Amino acid sequence: MDSVSNVSVNEQGKFNDKEEGFSNLKSLKHVSHSETDFEVSNDEDNQLLELGYKPVFKREFSTWATFSFAFSISGLFATVVTTYSYPLISGGAPSAVWCWLIAGAGCMCIALSVAELVSAYPTSGGLYFTCKDLVPARSMPVVAWVVGWLNLLGQAAGVSSTDWSCAQLLLAAVSISTDLKYIPTNQHIVGVMAAVIVFHGLVNSLSTRWLDRITRFYATFHLIVLVVCMICLLAKCPKFNTGKYVFTDVQASSGWHPIGFSFLFGFLSVAWCMTDYDATAHIAEEIENAAVRAPNAIALALSITYVLGWVFNIVLAFTMGTDLDSLINSELGQPVAQIFYNVLGKKGSMAFTILSFIIINFTGITAMQANARTIWAFSRDQALPFSRYWYKINKTTTTPVIAVWLNVVFCIALNLIGLGSIEAIEAIFSVCAIALDWSYVIPIACKLIFGKRLNYKPGPWNLGWASHFVNAYAVCWTAFVSVIFLMPTVRPVTPQNMNYAVVVLAGVLLFSLVYWWSGARKSYIGPRINVDMESEDPFKTE
């Protein structure tokens, strides 16, 4: 067994000097049980040690479960169902079809760039951790701080918006069962949303073994539902729309001019569906051969989502009829649920709306699982108020249960904005896309700018010669769409339909900066090493 070289260590295996240990971290190789107070089980844990972290999770996610997790985070079938109103309002059927194709290409560039970095740094910190090696030392703490808070906000907004959609779909199914006699209200949606988030918190309080079992069969189930739904729509549709109507007949009802500009708001559906690319990274410490399996899962899952999502949008466009107003203003609150009702009747629409609800439940579970790991990893680096509490691992389940329930409380609070108006909740969808994508492209941009100078070493999964081109397009695309996602999607603008994404973003970032300047900057040094820090043992109880 190799020993620790070039690092000053005392008899108890503690670094004599924090800065010396940090600067010599890359010299840390395989560490034996006799040299530290924890056991190294395999090469995966040795790699984690080289990155500076104690292995504390069990690696119980199989190859299929890892792919299924990555695929579930998009919730393709259900997320298209719940966000189809955006392209319909911005440009009708052509917006749904072409926005998916165009925006999906940009999203794929982000996903592949993220997968590349996940391979190089397979830790629960995700892209936040990469700042340690991709940003010059002087700027690293503040850049890592901003990236971490953006990722945390984006993950929370992802859970909130997913579970809001979950509540909408469940109540839409109830409405269909009453032949539209029952119409959901804001208060009903908020109440069901809170119950759904609590349920997802309970599921995520289970052990990793149970989470693996729950996740494992999801991908097969999801793909079967998607294919069967498309077949049923095509088989039962009494009259298809023309190719001209589907691909070229742009009809904008957003109030924005020119129509070409209005068309761009359809990108939000794609950006919300194809995001949270690094969710798989947040369970990297629970995956065997994570440096290969995690990026493979991200790339494959997003590629399938991109292709099948485009096909599904085309099928919906051909079968939805031509009365856009009735779809957009449907009492069900979901245009696709109305399409199901029109084409498949009461029983068929109930079946696929309920299946959408089940699928997006899985998305909510995996999104919360990823966000809990984000909170845990960020707390490990002492970047949150009261980090010592959120960093605890439950000894029975070996999962961050306290972080899960912090997530539950925050996400419910975030969704209370929906009590004001249904339109106001749009801000949470926008925040999810903007915050997450910027938490990705900042490290990607740093890799482009500083990677060569800082001797960046790619992982076993990388893009080779195409890396710089894909990375650059990902950065440019994110900068472009972020401007669109901060704007109101309809005009004239009123307090009810205003896009409050900028308020949510500014509020959370302002809090993080105040916390930074009020004292965190003195103690926060960026992603920390903890290979020998007994005081940060996540299994210790208070």
Curated annotation (Swiss-Prot):
InterPro entries: AA/rel_permease1, AA_permease, Amino_acid_permease_CS. One of its GO terms (biological process) is amino acid transmembrane transport. Keywords: Amino-acid transport, Glycoprotein, Golgi apparatus, Membrane, Transmembrane, Transmembrane helix, Transport. The keyword Transmembrane applies. The chain crosses the membrane at residues 61-81, 95-115, 139-159, 188-208, 217-237, 255-275, 298-318, 348-368, 402-422, 424-444, 469-489, 500-520. GO terms for molecular function: amino acid transmembrane transporter activity; gamma-aminobutyric acid transmembrane transporter activity. This is Uncharacterized amino-acid permease C15C4.04c. Pfam families: AA_permease_2. It is a multi-pass membrane protein. Glycans are attached at residues 6, 394. It comes from Schizosaccharomyces pombe (strain 972 / ATCC 24843) (Fission yeast). It comes from the Eukaryota. Belongs to the amino acid-polyamine-organocation (APC) superfamily. It is found in: Golgi apparatus; Membrane. One of its GO terms (cellular component) is cell division site.
